[in-house]
Amino acid sequence: MSTRLWEAQFVFSMADDADPDCAMAYWGQAMTQIHPLWQDNLNAEEYARGLELTKKAQSIADTTQREKQYFKAAEVFYAGGLSQTMKEGYVNMSRIWDETSTSMPNDMDAKAFNALFKIAIAKSEDDREVAGQLALDILQEMSNHPGGHHYVIHAFDTANLAGK
């Protein structure tokens, strides 16, 4: 795990220490193990830990519909475990991020995750362009959204799409 991801995992862990009822702290820890841009494989222990953290987040009663959707995206990834490829896990997550960003069109973070997982599952430059357009749409709404900028770069990072 990179230093930045380790730091993120540590900070989310500090958040759940400070507030054990902060469901997003558990979800955040689970998400630090998922790396769709470089698609490293997880082992059985990592899948189990991610699912455990996700289930902990889901067990906290006072969560919003938005949070429940975020937890659902992590759950579909982790629940498949080693019986699915990483790509299949990302496809499952992408489906949930599609649902979430459609049902909550003002949620720029859901749109950013949608763009991220579309990049991860892209089979063609057309698919990457769709992901890039999602990221550009975020920037139309919120010009300083870091995910929007980050995923525009990754989506269009091919010789044919570079000028977009």
Please tell me what each predicted stretch does.
Residues 21-37, 62-82, 105-123, 142-159:
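Amphipathic alpha-helical repeat scaffolds of TPR domains
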Residues 5-15, 49-60, 89-104, 127-142, ...:
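Amphipathic alpha-helices of TPR/Sel1-like and other helical repeat/solenoid scaffolds
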Residues 7-67:
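Post-signal peptide N-terminal segment of secreted/secretory-pathway proteins
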Residues 2, 39-45, 82-88, 123-126:
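Short coil/turn and helix-start
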Residues 1-11, 71, 75-86:
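Alpha-helical segment of the N-proximal tetratricopeptide repeat
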